[in-house]
From Swiss-Prot:
Species this chain originates from: Oryza sativa subsp. japonica (Rice)
This protein's encoding gene: CKX9
Tissues where the protein occurs: Expressed in inflorescence meristems.
GO molecular function: cytokinin dehydrogenase activity; FAD binding; oxidoreductase activity
Location(s), subcellular: Secreted, Extracellular space; Cytoplasm, Cytosol; Nucleus
Protein name in the entry: Cytokinin dehydrogenase 9
Length: 521
């Protein structure tokens, strides 16, 4: 896998000049036909600057218009209109949820942005029957889904660490967190989707109905359609969570304990690990501790320049089951090889745990440390290569530098559906590794991007077999390498559902009106 060298060089050049990546192209006249479309919602043609921003704060590509849909029909009408303009039109369309893309993936330069959050509110419906589920808009935030389903004592099974993301947004990628080892990513926990394709067709799909589109859209990076509704299976929600953290000095014990836990039948409900290279850094970011007594914060665990590893786990319980929970937790802890004096735990409500990152977000916003550039790197590493990777990256590349939390935890391949579009390593266990950097100032951004490049370059040369999660490439060769043997299937699905390459241009996979994507006869 070759890294996006050209992309990094462009970013570094622009940052050296003191700015972020902003594309300024001559403003074309907005097609008057857009204004003539009959809609339940409306277009904005002037106040569009917010749609040119994202969480990454590294790219800004202004659209020509923003659609605030009042219905799914508005989205279909708009996409169908652009489709009928034909292959010679340069107009593209991107669905934007809560704007948490990192490198402009949810943007559309001089195109149309669909503000998906306009679709939320009165569209959620919970069915609490024998096989409970919730129907949620693609623009609904997961935190709102949680609040609504908890009214029925129910909740989805699989989550992301941060809940202020849209349903359609995470399902277009994968949606991973500490529950993934058991339940799989969020894309493995979907019963049905409603999708508006690149032709403007509204299609309901599931594993049994229009299954190819269903699996294409899950993890499909928005390339095959706009997810306007998802049916998510639910399970009984616990009232409380026992939240634990322990520390390790030895990477082998740290990873072996994690692998043992994710393979056990009786285990914790959530398992994540993170790497602590710079203790000061870990205290000033969104993964900061839940309590001053947390071992990550405790002064008695000064690392003397050594890398520390923290294992974070939870056990769900209801108050009347506290004694049983205690026994189960103690049994599990007795099998682990952490530093005995580093154990810390606290009991919190289920929603307090799931929404933990938002609590840190509020503190960082108050300090002006949230809306800063986030040059993140998210990768997936085969289990067989994790020690080779860690030795070089944590021992050398990042030895003296860390601008944010580093997550590292294993998951089971058996919980992922290989019919979806997401790309994962071909091993039964693989690791999710996330370098979640915050960067203040052009020099810091440049430094972090350089570290990201060095990590990818090393992984490529050493044959680590890394796959990017939330992939960020700029050339067809890079995308072809990313998808490997699945590239042909991905291309064929694109031709079937978005033949003019109208959708999600910010992913930079296909160019509109490309000769390789002809209109079907």
């Amino acid at each position: 896998m070759r890294p996006s060298l050209l992309q990094y060089l462009k970013l570094l050049l622009l940052l050296a000049l003191g700015g972020v990546t902003t594309m300024h192209v001559p403003k074309q006249d907005v097609p008057s036909s857009l204004e003539e479309l009959t809609l339940d919602g409306h277009f904005s043609f002037h106040d569009v600057s917010a749609a040119a921003q994202d969480f990454g704060n590294l790219s800004s590509f202004p659209p020509v218009a923003v659609l605030h849909p009042g219905s799914v029909a508005d989205i279909a009408t708009t996409i169908r209109h652009v489709f009928l303009m034909g292959e010679h039109s340069t107009l593209t369309v991107a669905a934007r949820g809560h704007g948490h893309s990192l490198y402009g993936q949810s943007q559309a330069a001089e195109g149309i942005i669909i503000s998906m959050e306009s679709l939320q509110s009165n569209t959620m419906r919970v069915n609490p029957g024998v096989s409970p589920y919730v129907d949620a808009s693609g623009g609904e935030l997961w935190i709102n889904v949680l609040h609504e389903t908890l009214k029925y004592g129910l909740a989805p099974k699989s989550w992301t660490d941060y809940l202020h993301l849209t349903v359609g947004g995470t399902l277009s990628n994968a949606g991973v967190s500490g529950q993934t080892f058991r339940h799989g990513p969020q894309i493995s926990n979907v019963n049905e989707l409603e999708i508006v394709t690149g032709r403007g067709d509204v299609i309901t799909c599931s594993p049994e109905q229009n299954s190819d589109l269903f699996h294409a859209a899950l993890g499909g990076l928005g390339q095959f359609g706009v997810i306007t509704r998802a049916r998510i299976p639910l399970e009984p929600a616990p009232k409380m969570v026992r939240w634990l953290r322990v520390l390790y000095l030895d990477f082998t014990s740290f990873t072996e304990d994690q692998e043992m836990l994710i393979s056990a039948e009786k285990t914790f409900d959530y398992i994540e690990g993170f790497v602590i290279i710079n203790r000061t850094g870990i205290l000033n970011n969104w993964r900061s501790s839940f309590n001053p007594q947390d071992p990550v914060r405790s002064s008695q665990f000064e690392s003397d320049g050594k890398v520390l590893f923290c294992l974070e786990m939870t056990k769900n319980f209801n108050p009347d089951e506290a004694d049983v929970m205690e026994q189960e937790v103690n049994t599990l802890l007795s099998q682990l090889r952490y530093m005995p004096s580093s154990l810390f735990h606290t009991d919190v409500t289920y929603i307090e745990f799931l929404d933990r990152v938002h609590s840190s977000e509020m503190k960082l916003r108050a300090k002006g440390m949230w809306e800063v550039p986030h040059p993140w790197l998210n990768i997936i590493i085969p289990r067989s290569m994790i020690h080779k990777f860690a030795k070089e990256v944590f021992g050398k590349i990042l030895k003296d530098s860390n601008n944010g939390p580093i997550l590292l935890y294993p998951v089971n391949k058996s919980r992922w559906d290989n019919r979806t579009s997401v790309v994962i390593p071909d091993e039964e266990v693989f690791y999710l590794v996330a370098f979640l950097s915050s960067a203040l100032g052009p020099h810091n951004i440049k430094h972090t991007l350089d570290l990201n490049y060095r990590i990818i370059e090393f992984s490529d040369k050493a044959g680590i077999g890394v796959k990017q999660y939330l992939p960020n490439y700029t050339t067809e060769q890079e995308w072809q390498s990313h998808f490997g043997a699945r590239w042909d299937t991905f291309q064929q699905r694109k031709k079937a559902y978005d033949p003019l390459a109208i959708l999600a241009p910010g992913q930079r996979i296909f160019q509109k009106a490309s000769a390789s994507l002809p209109l079907p006869s």
